[in-house]
Amino acid sequence: MSEDQAVSFEDRLVRVTEGEFEGWYVWQSDAFEQRAGPFYERFDADGRGIAAFRADLRHMNGGGFMHGGCLMTFADSAIFTFARHALGKSHAVTMNLSGDFLDSARVGELIEARGEVTRAGGKTIFVRGVATADGRPVLSFTAIIKKIGPRV
């Protein structure tokens, strides 16, 4: 996206108005996440970020289980939901993301991630989370995010 095409942060996050994820939000400007997910997000009553998507056949590997790369891509998206308040108006990138696969996920399951910021200071934010498939833990992950400048 060129600077002429840039839109504000608030314009990129769109509220879903129908379907299973009605009331959630999705990034309309992230073509990769749309293809990989799409991934949805919202905040609970306590202000904690939640990310989710419905497992589809295209998310599965040759063995019929969710591809590990899909889960890690989802985790990489979710960490920014968890860090939203710590990020403020800053743009950021993932410096490190590591995960431990705990179980497999299958077609039709609701994949949901919940997490928290464990430390935020200066330009670095540390995050951890767990992704579940229909409530069953499938991935635990930790990440380091680096702020790189204000959002357009």
What are these regions (language model features)?
Residues 1-152:
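Terminal targeting signals and extreme-terminal segments of soluble enzymes
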